[in-house]
Amino acid sequence: MKMTSRKLSDILKKRLQNDSWSFHFDREKDSLRIEDKNTGKGITLELPGIIAKWEQKKDDAIDEVVYYTEEALNAMKGQSQEMEGRESLIYPVIRSTSFPEKSSAGVPLVFDGHTAETRIYYALDLGNTYRLIDEKMLEKEGWTKERIRETASFNLRSLQTVVKEDEVAGNHFYFFRANDGYDASRVLNESILAEYEKNAEGTLAVSIPHQDVLIIADIRNNAGYDILGQMSMSFFANGTVPITALSFLYEDGKLEPIFILAKNRPKKK
């Protein structure tokens, strides 16, 4: 069966059927908007990305979308989304530069530049989901952008790190997977990158293919670049929130995107 946006929209509507929710399929934008009728809050699902995952994972991909959608809508309805008094629940999240700059309601989101491929957004953790912080929230609660940055950075450094090491063809790869929603965000923790750079025997490279993994690689031979490229593409294709399939060289505290060419050293983008 060939999956189309219309078919996927119909499947999701059936799976998410709820008298309190409304659905709007936008054919031009290839998206499905789901809103709580009582609160007016909701989420917009980008269907092409879900179809790409469905082609690889079939019903498992739809199960994931249904789970996260239900969690998000229930959280929006049942929890306060004020920042005051919940400072410890504010974290930075990494997204691609193609990620929207405004919320579904048209309110500008709070974000900073990061690399040519990525941006830093800020989120209020709601348990099994989160809300991206927008400028309206800042204005309402009297917060400054600098306060958000400092608070999120402090909270990020307090998170526990869970790292798995793997050696492939003489190269060392370190996978950060605490599964707390902020694994990719750990790329913003300068002390982590500085430590790995100090101990690296080869060239230090970094990959942030999706929000739930950070890969740090100690590349000790040319094969390592190919291996990292393959890993990055695989994680990117299977992530719930993809970020970028490109990898980065880490030198002197800076990340520079690179293209990894088979059998060769990478070319700077």
From Swiss-Prot:
InterPro entries: DUF1444. It comes from Bacillus licheniformis (strain ATCC 14580 / DSM 13 / JCM 2505 / CCUG 7422 / NBRC 12200 / NCIMB 9375 / NCTC 10341 / NRRL NRS-1264 / Gibson 46). Belongs to the UPF0354 family. This is UPF0354 protein BLi03134/BL00047. It holds the Pfam family DUF1444. It comes from the Bacteria.
